From Swiss-Prot:
Listed transmembrane segments: none
Protein name (record): Zinc finger CCCH domain-containing protein 28
GO MF terms held by the record: DNA binding; DNA-binding transcription factor activity; mRNA binding; zinc ion binding
Keywords on record: DNA-binding, Metal-binding, Repeat, Zinc, Zinc-finger
Coiled-coil positions: none
Pfam families named among the record's database cross-references: zf-CCCH
ZnF segments: C3H1-type: 71-99, 143-171
Any one Gene Ontology BP term: regulation of DNA-templated transcription
Amino acid sequence: MSHRRDYGSDAVHVRITHDPPPENCFPNSGDSSVWATEDDYSRVWAINSDGAESPSKKTRSSSSSEIGKSFFKTKLCFKFRAGTCPYSASSCHFAHSAEELRLPPPPPPNWQETVTEASRNRESFAVSLGPRGNVAQTLKSPNWKTRICNKWQTTGYCPFGSHCHFAHGPSELHTFGGGLVEGECKIGTSATLDTKQRGQVDTVTSLVSPGVSSQRTSSAVTQKPNGVRTQRKWKGPDKISRVYGDWIDDIE
């Protein structure tokens, strides 16, 4: 900044220049904490651009503007030192000399409680995410490990490991809704599940005619009061195949 006096009048012309100031203008230039950083400039420019925003955004950013005003001239302008600051000393948010520096405002009375609460919220958020195992434990469905894993049973290997939705052996079998299967129930359930893996119903379509035994068989599963399910075969067509055809043989 330079001054030029017009000797024909009392007017003084002020011309703003971007020449770097002398080094002795900043006595504490070696202390990096007194200089504004790029984050400080970005924050100030964001606050100054609130004038072009909608009224709803202005309301949300009013608190940020108040905070920005409280830190006015609390740091030295690094861009002014480099000769690249586009603002004058009165309009720049940062100090252009040591005389303009102001002490930063004291922290609010409850700043320690605020920091502690923020830290507690971050910890609770991290715990809520948790590792994969905890999430799987929380999100278990009622059908969790109520059936034997087909891949594990046929190949002896399952890529899901302990996170598999199905049981890897009778020892991991659970009842519907949770809880391990105990005693005879485990044996009966395991046998039934093995039958299901191989195919519970085996149906062969055949032509039923008088004098020819039907090969059609089906499986029926019954459950006893103690919880053990058993399987028995029923040859239904053999019993009813001649019900409607016997009278023809009698006539002949």
